[in-house]
């Protein structure tokens, strides 16, 4: 692990540290006074730093939301590890390589034409990504993490990746927070296989908006919701829809306190 820089975020005590693991960049924040809770976030470019976010100036405001909810609940806020995706000018498909659920979206799986990668050299590497996250990054930054007090969060393809992580690494964390999970990359069969593989012991949050691409989500998300009920997740599962909410960091930040409360209030 090599440190790149440290910076401050308005409304957040202490510093965010930017480090590098080989070619992988990671931002992390550990609250003053310590904590035993850990939140692992995909698309780390968008978590703390408006200069690196997809939509300039828009971030998740994740630490601010975590501080607010934790104060409300009377607990120490969680540490946050924000893992950057791999997309660069040279590798525009890096994010997809990291986040596509490798064991479920194979070359034989139906993929909506809008999301197909034409490059024959494209190879999904999400298993490598999660191996690095759980076996290298987390132990180095937050070595005393426990599954019971660890959650993973992501949006869009990061939402699917979060659910995939629960399937592939159920022993590493126990709460999956998937905002605007991008089910429409495929079809009902893909969604069914993933839902049926989710560990029944985990808490799972899913949500969607009603603007932009999120308007396409209801049919498959409703299908997923029914499967989750049938599987017997009970109060360990919560699915919500938000008005005037789109497919961007600003929208997700507006209701981020709700999935965080779902996780932390237990």
Predicted regions and their residues:
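Non-catalytic cap/lid and distal C-terminal segments of serine-dependent acyl enzymes
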Residues: 1-266
């Amino acid at each position: 692990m090599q440190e790149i820089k440290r910076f401050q975020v308005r409304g957040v005590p202490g510093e965010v540290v930017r480090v590098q693991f080989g070619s992988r960049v990671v931002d992390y924040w550990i609250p003053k006074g310590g904590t035993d809770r850990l939140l692992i976030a995909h698309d780390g470019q968008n978590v703390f730093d408006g200069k690196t976010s997809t939509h300039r100036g828009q971030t998740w405001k994740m630490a601010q939301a975590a501080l607010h909810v934790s104060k409300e609940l009377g607990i120490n806020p969680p540490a946050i590890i924000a893992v950057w995706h791999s997309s660069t000018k040279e590798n525009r498909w890096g994010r997809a390589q990291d986040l596509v659920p490798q064991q479920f979206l194979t070359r034989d799986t139906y993929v909506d034409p809008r999301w197909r990668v034409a490059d024959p050299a494209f190879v999904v590497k999400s298993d490598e990504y999660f191996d690095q996250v759980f076996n290298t990054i987390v132990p180095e930054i937050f070595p005393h993490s426990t599954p019971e007090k660890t959650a993973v969060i992501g949006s869009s393809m990061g939402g699917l990746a979060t659910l995939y992580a629960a399937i592939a690494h159920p022993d590493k964390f126990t709460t999956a927070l998937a905002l605007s999970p991008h089910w429409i990359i495929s079809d009902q069969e893909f969604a069914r296989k993933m839902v049926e593989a989710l560990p029944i012991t985990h808490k799972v949050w899913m949500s969607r908006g009603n603007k932009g691409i999120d308007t396409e989500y209801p049919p498959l998300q409703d299908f997923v919701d029914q499967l989750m009920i049938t599987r017997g997740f009970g109060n360990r599962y919560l699915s919500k829809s938000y008005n005037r909410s789109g497919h961007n960091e600003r929208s997700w930040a507006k209701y981020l306190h709700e999935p965080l409360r779902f996780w932390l209030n237990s």
